[in-house]
A protein has these predicted regions:
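Conserved NAD(P)+-binding/catalytic subdomain of aldehyde/semialdehyde dehydrogenases
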Residues: 1-70, 75
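NAD(P)-dependent aldehyde/semialdehyde dehydrogenase
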Residues: 60-174
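Short secondary-structure boundary segments
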Residues: 177
Length: 177
């Protein structure tokens, strides 16, 4: 039996292991998105890209491994912050596969994000812990697993830099343009 996922998924799969079966488990898969500088060509384009990124991030309230947890954005701090603000607005929307208010972030995320609020301007946070969505801009990937509509945005000077954030655990990469 081969299973991918976090602790609860592996525990559930282990129930089916019996004589003649062996459990082979793999870490959860993580998806990301990459947004190119072209997103900033107009306000309309930026809003469209923020909507697309929100769609990528909120599938099944981010429970699906194909939901983006990290988004690398090519741009300067002002541009990336504008994207983050628009993304935050779009996370809290009812969708076919996501609710406006999903599960609230767990204590690990809350504690880490509260600490990051004191580290501006290097880190910046949009949103609260009410389940409507949270965006964290940081100079590198955060050291917690973003879930429950929590998105980590990482500014990059060039799109090729985003490749360094992909690992063996990366499942899907959304790309704009």
């Amino acid at each position: 039996l081969v299973a991918w996922g976090g602790g609860s998924a592996i525990e559930n799969a282990a129930k089916y292991v019996g004589p003649g079966f062996q459990l082979i488990s793999f870490d959860p898969k993580v998806s990301m998105s990459i947004v190119g500088r072209e997103a900033f060509e107009s306000e309309e384009t930026l809003r469209e890209v923020a909507e697309l990124a929100a769609l990528d991030a909120t599938i099944f309230n981010q429970d699906a491994c194909l939901a983006a947890r990290h988004i690398c954005v090519e741009g300067d701090d002002e541009q990336v912050d504008r994207f983050c603000a628009l993304l935050h607005e779009r996370l809290g929307v009812d969708r076919d596969f996501a609710e406006a208010f999903g599960p609230k972030p767990d204590a690990e995320i809350r504690d880490a994000v509260e600490g990051m609020r004191f580290l501006e301007p290097e880190y910046r946070v949009w949103g609260t812990f009410d389940g409507s969505g949270l965006v964290v801009r940081s100079p590198e990937m955060v050291d917690f697993h973003p879930t429950n509509k929590t998105v980590n945005v990482i500014p990059v000077a060039a799109m090729r830099e985003a490749a360094s954030y992909a690992t063996v655990a990366t499942q899907t990469v959304g790309v704009y343009p």
